[in-house]
């Protein structure tokens, strides 16, 4: 009986990590400070940056995929660790 209980405890602890949710920076400042919890299906953090009107624009957040299209001077960076899109 003790073996069964120990097995159930170990399995429960192992399964608790399955609900892990990624966090990514989500603000548009040069030095990001706020984060968001990504939905379960979001595997990437992204950072888009481009120059518009002589000013650098930045967009950050969570993404399903990692877009690799770079056009019109737009720089796109993707990563898979928490808060890696600073």
Swiss-Prot record:
GO terms, molecular function: toxin activity
Entry's localization field: Secreted
Major location (coarse): secreted
Protein name: Candiduxin-2
Signal sequence range: 1-21
InterPro entries (alphabetical): Snake_3FTx (IPR003571), Snake_toxin-like_sf (IPR045860), Snake_toxin_con_site (IPR018354), Toxin_cobra-type (IPR054131)
Keyword Membrane: no
Tissue specificity remark: Expressed by the venom gland.
Top-level taxonomy: Eukaryota, Metazoa, Chordata, Craniata, Vertebrata
Disulfide bonds, paired cysteine numbers: 24-45, 38-62, 66-78, 79-84
Keywords for the protein's UniProt record, in alphabetical order: Disulfide bond, Secreted, Signal, Toxin
Cellular component aspect of the GO annotation: extracellular region
Keyword field contains Ribosomal protein: no
Recorded family membership: Belongs to the three-finger toxin family. Short-chain subfamily. Orphan group IX sub-subfamily.
Transmembrane regions listed in the UniProt entry: none
One Pfam match: Toxin_cobra-type
